[in-house]
């Protein structure tokens, strides 16, 4: 599986998103693509890429035929579309649901199945979270080339997050961090809880005294 840079995967995610959500504006000009990459909504992290940054990555992806220049006729403005998957000669074939899940992971980073169900609504339909989990399990099932990885649960969270693996070991590093939370962090939480319990005990004792005084009167 080809390993992409963070900028490349942001560009691919934006092209996938805009192809589905605003087909009348697709393919995208360089200016529109840069704007999409730097959106403040539906992006994590928020970036401040320049046209030059985007164009450098676009040119690399064009050389590898992952993006094509769709400039037509006498137009002087280049327009770009992705060929990330489901192409005639490409090996990567994805369903609408699989593509939507990967698109959100490309643009927003690690997500829980519940978050993915909510955040893919403009891209495809999921009847329930179980359907999202099935898609994620399918994307992670290929032992030779898994597309996503399940991260360990964060402390206090009910659901584990999933991350894509198209940027290689970056996502693996996240998984390692999540699997080994520091003992000092756990100790701080325990101390805070013990302090809260002690405060509650004092309040209960004060209330008992107040009630006894009222009864004596």
Swiss-Prot record:
Organism this protein belongs to: Aliivibrio fischeri (strain ATCC 700601 / ES114) (Vibrio fischeri)
Family: Belongs to the UPF0502 family.
Pfam family, one: DUF480
Name under which the protein is recorded: UPF0502 protein VF_A0604
Species lineage: Bacteria, Pseudomonadati, Pseudomonadota, Gammaproteobacteria, Vibrionales
HAMAP family: UPF0502 (MF_01584)
Signal peptide range: none
Top-rank taxon, per record: Bacteria
TM region(s), chain numbering: none
InterPro entries assigned to the protein according to its UniProt record, in alphabetical order: DUF480 (IPR007432), WH-like_DNA-bd_sf (IPR036388), WH_DNA-bd_sf (IPR036390)
């Amino acid at each position: 599986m080809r390993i992409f840079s963070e900028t490349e995967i942001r560009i691919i995610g934006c092209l996938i998103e805009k192809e589905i959500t605003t087909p009348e504006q697709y393919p995208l000009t360089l200016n529109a693509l840069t704007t999409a990459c730097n959106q403040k909504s539906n992006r994590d992290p928020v970036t401040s890429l320049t046209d030059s940054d985007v164009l450098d990555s676009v040119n690399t992806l064009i050389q590898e035929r992952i993006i094509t220049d769709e400039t037509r006729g006498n137009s002087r403005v280049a327009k770009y579309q992705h060929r990330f998957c489901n192409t005639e000669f490409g090996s990567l074939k994805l369903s609408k649901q699989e593509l939507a899940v990967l698109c959100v992971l490309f643009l927003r980073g690690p997500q829980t199945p519940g978050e993915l169900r909510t955040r893919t609504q403009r891209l495809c339909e999921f009847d329930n979270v179980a359907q999202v989990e099935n898609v994620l399990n399918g994307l992670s099932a290929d032992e030779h080339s898994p597309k996503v990885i399940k991260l360990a649960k964060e402390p206090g969270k009910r659901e584990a997050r999933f991350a894509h693996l198209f940027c290689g070991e970056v996502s693996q590093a996240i998984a390692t961090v999540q699997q080994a939370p520091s003992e000092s962090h756990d100790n701080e939480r325990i101390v805070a809880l013990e302090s809260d319990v002690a405060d509650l005990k004092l309040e209960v004792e004060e209330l008992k005294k107040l009630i006894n005084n009222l009864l004596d009167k």
